[in-house]
């Protein structure tokens, strides 16, 4: 097998650059050496030091960020893009066992979601709670809080994340917690075509009906008869109350009609086009294509003149940004101090 020199940077969390979903695939075909002077760099959004590596760059994101192809040669992301051999869409929920961005096993959740429609007749008896809400990020679209408040006026919504926690204890196991509930509020932080994270899959895995908002094209991936799609009602980030009220009425209808509820549960989650095994094979093919080339042939970005000028501007901008980030905590500390002695 050929030997390849790689490195990862800016991936965030507890990412292990020697053992992750990318290295597991590459090890099927190559001998991997993780080195400081790589021939191929995988980078993400949590650092700007990728600009220090003059090698083939492969951008990966688990966030709602569009790749900058002036900086990277290849990219792995959420958006529905076509760019020759330089891009593949591989959303977060397909990343098996990738723990850098979540505390649970994606592989288990994905397999449960694929089989969520295979349930016994007494399945509904196991649902002891109405609806769950598990979030730690308060900086999200207004509609998420609006949905929580509106549904809470109908029945109690159990919030087990750091945001709006009303269960009085930290969450130990998200999957086991959500399994008790008939519904799950599965709202993304923002709404962008293609941006589908793990939230809807975790709801399916728990055997619950997702109340979903985020990717307006979600029906390209998941069966529209298997969940409540808030985009069908016209909900935007602002959380319009009259639209929220209509969604709540739909939740009430399903909550009060066991037959309709079970019919939705027994509908397969994934569309025929969203074949998980096929997407995995396409992802492998994408990676192997990059590394099967000799290094000079693998470059795609413009590395000369305008490409150099563009990258130089990025270096200056990134340096300023990261310096500002160092100052912000000091600024906030001074503000708190002045407020204390007012």
Indicate residue ranges for each PLM-predicted region:
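Pol beta-like nucleotidyltransferase catalytic core
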Residues: 2-61, 65-163, 168-171, 175-184, ...
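Flexible, polar/acidic helix-loop-strand segments at domain edges
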Residues: 189
């Amino acid at each position: 097998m050929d030997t390849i020199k790689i490195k990862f940077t800016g991936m965030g969390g507890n990412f292990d650059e020697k053992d992750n979903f990318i290295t597991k695939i590459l090890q099927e075909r190559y001998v991997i050496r993780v080195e400081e002077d790589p021939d191929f760099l995988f980078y993400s959004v949590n650092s700007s030091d990728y600009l220090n590596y003059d090698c083939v760059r492969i951008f990966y994101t688990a966030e709602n960020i569009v790749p900058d192809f002036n900086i990277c040669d290849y990219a792995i992301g959420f958006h529905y893009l076509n760019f020759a051999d330089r891009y593949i869409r591989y959303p977060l929920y397909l990343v098996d066992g990738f723990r850098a961005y979540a505390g649970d096993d994606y592989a288990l959740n994905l397999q449960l979601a694929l089989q969520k429609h295979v349930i016994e007749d007494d399945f509904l008896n196991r649902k002891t709670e109405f609806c769950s809400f598990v979030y730690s990020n308060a900086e999200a679209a207004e509609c998420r809080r609006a949905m929580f408040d509106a549904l809470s006026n109908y029945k109690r919504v159990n919030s087990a994340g750091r945001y709006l926690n009303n269960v009085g204890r930290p969450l130990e196991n998200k999957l086991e917690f959500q399994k008790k509930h008939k519904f799950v509020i599965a709202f993304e932080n923002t709404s962008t075509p293609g941006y589908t994270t793990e939230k809807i899959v975790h709801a399916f895995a728990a055997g619950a009906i997702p109340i979903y908002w985020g990717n307006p094209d979600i029906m390209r991936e998941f069966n529209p008869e298997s969940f409540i799609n808030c985009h069908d009602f016209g909900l935007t980030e602002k959380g319009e109350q009259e639209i929220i009220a209509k969604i709540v009425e739909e939740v009430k209808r399903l909550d009060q009609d066991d037959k309709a509820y079970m019919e939705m549960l027994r509908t397969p989650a994934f569309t025929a086009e969203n074949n998980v095994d096929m997407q995995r094979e396409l992802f492998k093919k994408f990676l192997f294509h990059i590394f099967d080339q000799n290094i000079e042939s693998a470059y795609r970005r413009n590395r000369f003149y305008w490409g150099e000028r563009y990258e130089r501007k990025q270096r200056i901008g990134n340096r300023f940004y990261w310096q500002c980030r160092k100052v912000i905590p000091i600024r906030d500390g001074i503000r708190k101090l002045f407020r204390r002695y007012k």
